[in-house]
Amino acid sequence: MEPPAIPHITEGFYPLPEIVETFSHHVLQELVSLAEVLPSMSNVEKKKKILDWLLRSRAFTMRLLVLARWVHLSPSVHRCIDVVAFLQGQKFCFQNLVHVLQDIRYQLSFARLRNSDLVTALDILSTGTSLRLANAPTSKLYMLSESPLSTKQILQTLHALNMLIRIRLSLYEIIPTPFQHFTIANGRCTFTVPNEFSVSLTTNSQDPKSTGISFQWIVVDFQFHLPDFSSTPAKYRVFIELHLNEEIAAAFVLQKPILPLIYNILHKFCLYQRLNLLSQQTFQLSRESWLGHLRGVYDEKPPRLRLYYWPQLNVKKEGKPGKIGHYIHIFVNTQPISAFERTLSSKRSSCEYDHFLLLVEWHHDGIVEHVPLDDHMDAQHLLLLITQKHAQLILEQIRKELHPNIFSEHVGGGLKIHVFDNEIIVKVNSVTGRLVLSSSASPLSPPRHLRAAEKNIALNTQPPAQILNRLYFFCIQTQLLEVAQCAELHAVQGYYSFPYLTFSKGKWRKDGDSLWVLAYNVESNSWSVRLLNAAGQTLYTQDVHTTKGTLSIESFSRLSYLLEVQILLFNVQTACQARGMPFEYLPIPPKALIEDDFTTYVQTGCLCIMMPSSNEDMLPVVFVRAHDGQLIFDSRIKGKLPYQSETETEKNCYIDWRTGRITIRVQNFSSFEKTWIGLLKLVALSKTSAFNVDCITLKHVDFTYLDDEKFRATIHDDNTFTLHFFNRHSPFHLISQFLQDTFSDGPSAIQPLRVIMDRTRGVLVAQELGYVVLARSLRQYRIILSKNHGIQVLLNRHGCILQDLSYLSADSRYLEGTQTLTSQWEPCSWLNTVWEGDLGDDELNGQIEAAPEMHLIKMNKTADLTAILKRILAISRKK
């Protein structure tokens, strides 16, 4: 028979191809990381970084070379290792056999003796000898063979044991609460505590009603169920079973409950075993991924574990690191039994056992927090859980110390700081404890200023919040300068210091070296428009209302455009101040339908001024805007006018006659003021009661006089008026040139024209009768009756005077001549004859008064001049 082959040992060995592949991946990863970092470094830093990497990689490469050369000798070495392992295994089997024999000897001391051999005793006592003992010890008859148990007997025995154990547990044993769930099978009872252990017990007692608690229990199997724990080695299992049986034997003698004792021993052993596993995992982490950032201290008396992490956060005193103020304390402690548990306690679920727990305390900033420990949580998960909580505390502290106007929020385990369109994301590395800064615009390769801020924070020279405040303001300044340059703006220095940034254009400089600038307050995130003199003093300032839009080149162009608008509005304000007119600057709602809705970033504004107006139909409130280098004035007319078309545009003025809205586009305030005066006169004309208003436009108003005389009042650019009578035979054509200056700006602007037309109509009616009428002015007229005879009509405030005149020597063609020719007219007696013969005072009801000696007829205001002249002229024709 050939001896068995020596087993080949593979545990703890790694194939060389896997080592080479792992090393290759590691080198490639470091090269990729190096390629990302090198472009942002200086030449000296690049050389230093490459040299460090070469020295470190050379050491690993030399080790790999040694392993490759050793491969040639590895078969012989492996064979020696297998032989040594085989011999050590045989030695362990021999030693284990000795220990097992000792244990059997110890355990058999508690076994019951077999029944007396009555057959042999009777044989010896009756015959004096025994046939079975007569043979030599080497004889086969020396060993008495026992009849083997049948399967039925075995099953009956196991069933009897199961019933015995079930009765004992149901009626007589005190079962701790963790042992509530158990299984009885194959003559044993198995108690399982999840994530801790399972233990199997049996008995050699035959009576479940043993007095007291003298029921004999024997541990026959044990297994650990701890997470991250391999199967229980045989030597540990045997040791634990032996220890448990010894404790059971001692408790059997002292009459103590067995099951609570077993649970206390095994539960406490599992807790200490888990604490030991956490210590081993911590030691492994401190040598690998957490190297330099973790230190574990394990104390055996009493067993406890302290984890010190992030040593760079130690408080420094006089340049020396102080005591660590944050660490994790893991230990086993007993918890008191609550009153609720005592109330629910029973024999089947007893609380009379040691309530040992594995507790985790987190010490930080003088505060102790209890952290729940999951059954499946290892050392790395526990560290990550604690460091993430610590990171949140650090980020929250930084958030509180940030500038009040810096908007930040917790997102995804980090702190997000908003800088216009971009975002600075601040996170804490869970392993190193250092702050990591990244940008949303370039998350893989953060800008140089972010890396510089990381370095300053790592040096721990200043509080992180102070560095982040400066970084925030630096990012704002950098982004503003970049966008301003694209928007053709340049930064202005020397006028304002931090926190203001000012921008301007060359064309914004006014006379006297005053300058318009856009000022941005980086602390309050607010814009303003300012006018500065040469000494840097602020002459005028106006806040700019911005919305939540993004800052871009388009938005900056909008700001530039807004400043140009503000310059125009400032000129209007200056004009209003000079004229003593009240004004107020108002922001326009962002959803208002206006023409200069350029972007959604800047909320434009308008100027509200109060224009002087004596016309109640014209609203004095005027809103002023600016667009494309022009001033836009908006106002309204109250009431409904007899318009010719619904809307009308005349040069720089637009009006909607339906709503009365007026829009005037001009270059300066003086032009608007001139147009405004013209509109006041136009509205005053349209609201008159002296005439019937037929139609109104921006240039003229059409009237009707006495239902048959239609004429038009036209307004010129210099706010003067001309009258035009549509009827070419109208008698008023004679005096139209004298009617131009009869208008005023009041509500009764056209009333004098009605009075004049009413009083002159009686004189001018002579034209309709075929006589020549001469107008020297609106008060003096001559009616030519013949070549050498006429009537002079003088209008005054009291009435009218008719004087009879005759022409001496001048030719009729000179009747329209100068005053010299007119003076040649002399009074005559014809009018006296008319008065004495055909006109009587009674007939005209006292409306006229004759003065024969002066050849005059006087009439008061109420006299009907038209009727009187018709009467006189009719009489003259008869003669």
From Swiss-Prot:
Keywords of the record: Activator, Nucleus, Transcription, Transcription regulation
Primary localization class, coarse: nucleus
GO CC annotation, single: core mediator complex
GO biological process: positive regulation of transcription initiation by RNA polymerase II; regulation of transcription by RNA polymerase II; transcription initiation at RNA polymerase II promoter
Locations listed in the record: Nucleus
Protein name: Mediator of RNA polymerase II transcription subunit 14
Domain of life of the native organism: Eukaryota
Stated family: Belongs to the Mediator complex subunit 14 family.
Subunit description: Component of the Mediator complex.
Described purpose of this protein according to its UniProt entry: Component of the Mediator complex, a coactivator involved in the regulated transcription of nearly all RNA polymerase II-dependent genes. Mediator functions as a bridge to convey information from gene-specific regulatory proteins to the basal RNA polymerase II transcription machinery. Mediator is recruited to promoters by direct interactions with regulatory proteins and serves as a scaffold for the assembly of a functional preinitiation complex with RNA polymerase II and the general transcription factors.
